[in-house]
């Protein structure tokens, strides 16, 4: 059975996200996601972004915008009901810049709160539409699991990799690895090992970080839609990496910049009484016009 839906394509720091504007039942998320991820929006619909500048624009993930009831915050479900920081800040940008739902602050900045799958509380965003920039409060980790490099079979590649941390961001868990080369084969082995120890996670990522350059290569698996991607950038993984860096710091405010395959993300953490109290994440983004598609 065919259906017509309206979508927009978002480019939050290269983590290309398709937003479905038409209300869709949750049980249809998987089928629609599978269809949308096959479409080249650059070649078929003329979508073009400045960074990365490519004639091909393929989605990496799909978010479904929820119908709003009176008094409710704007909301979004990711296709696997996971959490995604890049999708969340792009959704907040769409709500403020395109629908006028933000509250004005000084200097042309707007703020609003949203709700999202994989996070049990609202998140607050700051939007600068003229600068194509959005910052969002990130959820704090709900659990931390420590592995050794030897336990993960990585000691031969990096003998200095003593402690590795799996950071559970509630809707997605990320393994943070320094100075380990990324590959799908390695990712599959790491996922198998982590799942054997921690159970089957809804969504799992490995953040492969070159410690000298702070270049981060994100690989993410979402169980319910069975997708694995080398992502252009990963916001929740970047926040998890910043959290691990913050574990090494004294109380204070610290900023970290992580370059990624298709964009750069910026994080700020605040540490108080030996605990990380806040994480925010920001970066550039772009949106396409509304596109109507027959599936």
Question: Model segments located where?
Answer:
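Long, low-complexity, Lys/Arg-enriched
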Residues: 131-135
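A glycine-rich beta-to-alpha transition motif near the start of alpha/beta enzyme domains, typified by
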Residues: 1-130, 143, 166-168, 173-295
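Short, cationic low-complexity segments
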Residues: 153-170
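Intrinsically disordered, low-complexity regions enriched in acidic/Ser/Thr/Pro/Gln residues
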Residues: 136-140, 145, 149-151, 165, ...
